[in-house]
């Protein structure tokens, strides 16, 4: 990755242009390597962005703030990471997986800018296939609002490293929609790119 280091509104930032995924054959330790890199550079706060499918009626196509997560990938980076021996404990607490004050901050910024955002629980799955109707039904029963193929392992790693976490999502489709394709996901993402940028800039300005 060709990362970018600079400032946004005088806030020092490190920006990574993408991520690797478990479904590409990488391990959970490899998938979370950018989180460790950011912490090594001195980052205390980290903002994760992900594309998701909206699972419930309370989550619509558009921007959302993640409030909690369910790891359905069957992986955990703390099992595979050699550096776990240097962490105080491998039994990392995941209460407030997404830092409350950052969630509140993002909600306030969205309201001030007139950007519509939903909030909800995120389920991370292995992928790369989209979910079956039965799987979506299970997630609804579990209280899931959004589903995607990333992020949950990265959040675990961030907590192990003592970082504050904000999760922002763009729900690009309603999960279970038979017309969903990779191309349609990219098309919807493009429509919301400007609002997403404004939201992130607004949050950074207040950090």
Identify the residue ranges that each predicted region occupies.
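Metabolite-binding pocket within alpha/beta catalytic cores that recognizes anionic/polar moieties
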Residues: 1-94
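Active-site/ligand-binding-proximal alpha/beta "capping" segment
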Residues: 103, 108-145, 200, 207
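Zn-dependent metallopeptidase/amidohydrolase metal-coordination segment
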Residues: 149-185
């Amino acid at each position: 990755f060709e990362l970018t280091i600079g400032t946004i509104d005088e806030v020092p930032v490190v920006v990574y242009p993408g991520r690797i995924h478990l479904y590409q054959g990488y391990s959970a330790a490899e998938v979370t390597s950018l989180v460790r890199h950011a912490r090594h550079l001195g980052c205390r706060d980290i903002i994760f962005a992900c594309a998701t499918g909206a699972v419930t009626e309370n989550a619509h196509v558009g921007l959302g703030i993640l409030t909690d997560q369910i790891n359905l990938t069957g992986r955990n980076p703390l099992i595979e990471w050699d550096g776990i021996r240097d962490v105080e404990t491998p039994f990392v607490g995941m209460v407030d997986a997404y830092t409350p004050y950052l969630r509140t901050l993002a909600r306030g910024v969205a309201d001030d800018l007139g950007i519509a955002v939903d909030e909800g629980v995120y389920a991370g799955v292995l992928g790369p296939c989209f979910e079956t109707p039965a799987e979506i039904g299970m997630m609804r029963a579990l209280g899931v609002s959004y589903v995607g193929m990333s992020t949950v392992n990265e959040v675990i790693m961030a907590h192990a490293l003592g970082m504050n976490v904000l999760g922002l999502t763009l729900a690009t489709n309603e999960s279970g929609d038979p017309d969903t394709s990779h191309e349609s996901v990219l098309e919807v993402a493009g429509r919301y790119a400007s609002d997403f940028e404004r939201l992130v800039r607004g949050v950074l300005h207040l950090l």
